[in-house]
Amino acid sequence: MARVKRGVVARARHKKILKQAKGYYGARSRVYRVAVQAVTKAGQYAYRDRRQRKRQFRQLWITRINAAAREHGLSYSCLINGLKKAFIDIDRKMLADIAVFDKPSFAALAKKAKEALL
């Protein structure tokens, strides 16, 4: 059986990892062994945080909607319930955007929600 020299393959693998670790601090960007650990951990954090980002944005939207709703004498849950009863189908992202950038429109939505609750 012929001898297999893997210098080219190893070099390519090392280059790939070190390229991914570019910009890391100290040995994490220069030493292969440390870079492998750093890149692996970074990948785990990225995977986790892609999911957390969705939760955090939803949380932010709800907080903004709640603050705007309370200015109109409603709690967040009452506003959402009122909008559902009034058959106004609008997602939290758009509702939060309206609450921040278009206050008159949000006031109209809050009024409709209040009327639907009565």
Curated annotation (Swiss-Prot):
GO molecular-function term, one example from the UniProt record:
rRNA binding
The yes or no answer to whether the keyword Transcription is present is no
Q: Which InterPro entries match?
A: Ribosomal_bL20, RIBOSOMAL_L20_CS, Ribosomal_protein_bL20_C
Q: Does the keyword Lipoprotein apply?
A: no
Q: Which GO terms describe its cellular component?
A: ribonucleoprotein complex; ribosome
Sorted alphabetically, which keywords does the UniProt record give?
A: Ribonucleoprotein, Ribosomal protein, RNA-binding, rRNA-binding
**Any one GO biological process:** ribosomal large subunit assembly
Family to which this protein belongs: Belongs to the bacterial ribosomal protein bL20 family.
Purpose: Binds directly to 23S ribosomal RNA and is necessary for the in vitro assembly process of the 50S ribosomal subunit. It is not involved in the protein synthesizing functions of that subunit.
NCBIfam families for the chain: rplT_bact
**What protein is this chain from?**
Large ribosomal subunit protein bL20
**Taxonomic source organism:** Hamiltonella defensa subsp. Acyrthosiphon pisum (strain 5AT)
Supply the gene name.
Answer: rplT
